[in-house]
Amino acid sequence: MNLSLRRSTSALLASSLLLTIGHGATLPFMTIYLSRQYSLSVDLIGYAMTIALTIGVVFSLGFGILADKFDKKRYMLLAITAFASGFIAIPLVNNVTLVVLFFALINCAYSVFATVLKAWFADNLSSTSKTKIFSINYTMLNIGWTIGPPLGTLLVMQSINLPFWLAAICSA
């Protein structure tokens, strides 16, 4: 693997880890956030989360199909920008509908990034490197989901908005 490809691969693996830490720090606390900030009942929170996650999945399917038609690096940068923008916007808006839409955007961006990242690895890595890099990426995802929720717990005890700011910083 040449130096440029090695650097790109390392940067993408680090991005995968950081985005997952940010997502893991916020996803478990969305119910608390919606309850505290907007006094939503449990059933309304369930509907809001279901809508946000469903929108994210449906749109990510379409964007995943488009991934092969466009420059993957640019597509990943767009996903990271959308991810960061969503996490910056959630604590700043004062409207539950916008929060749900931004959360849908975040989930879509996370799914798109993950899909396009795998496609980039498949397109650019040699067959001998693919197995190793895919394995490392899954390890990064597991580490991110292991670190994110406890870190989110520590932050939410200080301020309900801190996990969102962490997620935005992680994606920068």
Task: Please place each PLM-identified region on the residue numbering.
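Structural signature of the two symmetry-related core transmembrane helices
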Residues: R74-A89
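Cytoplasmic helix-loop-helix junction between adjacent transmembrane helices
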Residues: A104-L141
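Helix-loop junctions at membrane interfaces in 12-TM secondary transporters
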Residues: P91-F103
